[in-house]
A protein has these predicted regions:
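Bacterial N-terminal signal peptides
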Residues: 7-16
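Bacterial lipoprotein signal-peptidase II cleavage site
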Residues: 24-28
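Active-site-adjacent loop/helix surface patches within enzyme catalytic domains
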Residues: 100-129
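Helical scaffold of the NTase/Pol beta-like nucleotidyltransferase catalytic core
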Residues: 77-109
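Positively charged n-region of N-terminal signal peptides that target proteins for export
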Residues: 1-4
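Catalytic cores and adjacent binding grooves of peptidoglycan-active enzymes
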Residues: 31-43, 48, 52, 56-71, ...
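Short, compositionally biased low-complexity segments
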Residues: 68-80
Length: 185
């Protein structure tokens, strides 16, 4: 029996059998190096004066899953909290390192912005927010996002260049006052 206990873990490693924690979104490849990189970029972003983080949901709720809560949780190396109201599923998810890296590059290239949602809030049922792959912004370069803001189109174009495959803003349904950028699953 003792030999079986010793052999099973070795067998699991050799055959590639893995275990997924309940906090995983199932699609992420959260190796140690990607978690370290995401933690480092989240810390950098949390401390960057060019980015502000909404401390509550746009709906007004304080549920521990605001953009500010999410960036603090990610910078501490943790999975971040998702809201559990409306269509939000609750639970936790790790933020995607590609998205965090893109946000960092946007700052380094001179954009200032306010993040209103990452994994929290209530979105469409299949929203990539719930997978830690999307963020919303309502101010860019000191101006409210809207048709008259001259910066939002360039901001979203740069997000696409940095890997976002879903970008929404003024002119798209339910996005007249904010931008949405999401990375692939």
């Amino acid at each position: 029996m003792k030999s079986l206990v010793l052999i099973l873990p070795l067998f699991a490693v050799l055959t590639g059998i893995g275990f997924v924690s309940c906090g995983s979104n199932g699609g992420e490849k959260a190796g140690k190096s990607s978690i370290r990189r995401a933690t480092s970029d989240a810390t950098w972003l949390k401390n960057a004066t060019q980015v502000t983080w909404l401390p509550r949901q746009v709906s007004g709720r304080y549920d521990g899953a605001s953009a500010l809560d999410n960036i603090r949780q990610a910078s501490a190396g943790h999975a971040v909290k998702r809201s559990s109201y409306g269509t939000a599923p609750g639970g936790y998810v790790r933020l995607d390192p590609r998205m965090l890296r893109a946000m960092k590059i946007l700052v380094k290239e001179g954009f200032t912005f306010r993040v209103t949602a990452i994994a929290g809030a209530s979105h469409s049922r299949t929203s990539r927010h719930y997978a830690g792959l999307a963020f919303d912004v309502d101010f860019i370069n000191g101006q409210k996002v809207g048709y008259v803001n001259p910066h939002w189109k360039r901001f979203l174009a740069r997000c696409r260049e940095l890997g976002a495959t879903e970008t929404l803003g003024p002119g798209d349904r339910a996005h007249s006052t904010h931008t949405h950028a999401a990375w692939p699953r």
